Amino acid sequence: MQPTSPAAPHRRLYTEEQRARRDATRWTLVQGILAPLQFLVFAISLGLVLWYLATGEGYAAATASILIKTFLLYTIMVTGAIWEKVVFGQYLFAPAFFWEDVFSFGVIALHTAYLWALFTGQPHGLQMGIALAAYATYVINAGQFLWKLRMARLDMEAAQ
């Protein structure tokens, strides 16, 4: 039987100083409000987009909802970058959130591609297809952030 080696030390998501800055900044509350709001708008918008694709009705409502979702995405990205600066000392790509930030740029690119399709008069089906692709990447990215939120909670429990 082979002796077992001790597990690699767990890398904490936040240092004590970063956790203190995270807990003290108003940008944490802003993110905590914007994230569920964006998800609510996403869920409504997804329903409207799927309704339009299924029935051919409701293009204006679907479009308006995608624009609202895109505005919220841009807002949460800007405020999230400010939050990272306050907590980690850099606007983007802090090691703790590097891959979430990388994937976020894909989400932004697809939402921006939707805006291009809308404002250049591309066919409605193409617009909605791009929106669905943007929404699929958003769901993955939201999952990344939810995972990090869980890791932060587990870190906090381990620290107590």
UniProtKB/Swiss-Prot annotation:
Keyword ATP-binding (UniProt): no
GO molecular function: hydro-lyase activity
Highest taxon listed in the record's lineage: Bacteria
EC identifiers of the protein: 4.2.1.-
Biological-process GO terms, alphabetical: light-independent bacteriochlorophyll biosynthetic process; photosynthesis, dark reaction
Keyword hit for Lyase: yes
Listed pathway(s): Porphyrin-containing compound metabolism; bacteriochlorophyll biosynthesis (light-independent)
InterPro entries, per the entry: BCHF
Keywords: Bacteriochlorophyll biosynthesis, Chlorophyll biosynthesis, Lyase, Photosynthesis
Pfam family, one: BCHF
Protein name: 2-vinyl bacteriochlorophyllide hydratase
